[in-house]
Amino acid sequence: MAGVSVRDVAAQDFINAYASFLQRQGKLEVPGYVDIVKTSSGNEMPPQDAEGWFYKRAASVARHIYMRKQVGVGKLNKLYGGAKSRGVRPYKHIDASGSINRKVLQALEKIGIVEISPKGGRRISENGQRDLDRIAAQTLEEDE
């Protein structure tokens, strides 16, 4: 399908399809500690999907950067952060782990999906945009 972009596909469908693509491809460098680490200091437990959550985070980050022109680690920390349960006190927003988001960006940069932006942060590369559009077209075909 010509002219299909990531914007034409539902977010959850695209993220699942791209995460499985990254997992099948096997080029994404996954840190050894992903099965035991929490994704935020506000979380009580690590993710339940011990093997696949890093790929889903990478797919989600790639889509997020595609939708916006450039994104830094700080913005991703805010995006993936959440509410911390503080007992009887009111909830409070806690940022996500910067280390995990930094490792995701470095892994995506290593396989050529994102590149460092001269203005700061990361932006999608030409090869990354082509790959994401191709996966989006395949996802749209499967849905129809």
Curated annotation (Swiss-Prot):
Primary location: cytoplasm
Domain of life: Eukaryota
A single GO molecular function term of this UniProt record: structural constituent of ribosome
Disruption phenotype: Disruption of a single RPS19 gene reduces cell growth; a double disruption is lethal. Depletion experiments show the proteins are required for correct maturation of precursor rRNA to generate the 18S small rRNA. A specific site between the 18S and 5.8S precursors (site A2 in ETS1) is not cleaved in disruption mutants. Partially assembled ribosomes are retained in the nucleolus rather than being exported to the cytoplasm. All effects are exacerbated in the double disruption. Increases association of NOC4 with 20/21S pre-rRNA, decreases association of ENP1, TSR1 and RIO2 with 20/21S pre-rRNA.
Pfam families, per database record: Ribosomal_S19e (PF01090)
Compartment annotation: Cytoplasm
Role summary: Component of the ribosome, a large ribonucleoprotein complex responsible for the synthesis of proteins in the cell. The small ribosomal subunit (SSU) binds messenger RNAs (mRNAs) and translates the encoded message by selecting cognate aminoacyl-transfer RNA (tRNA) molecules. The large subunit (LSU) contains the ribosomal catalytic site termed the peptidyl transferase center (PTC), which catalyzes the formation of peptide bonds, thereby polymerizing the amino acids delivered by tRNAs into a polypeptide chain.
Similarity field: Belongs to the eukaryotic ribosomal protein eS19 family.
Note: Present with 3440 molecules/cell in log phase SD medium.
Protein name, as recorded: Small ribosomal subunit protein eS19B
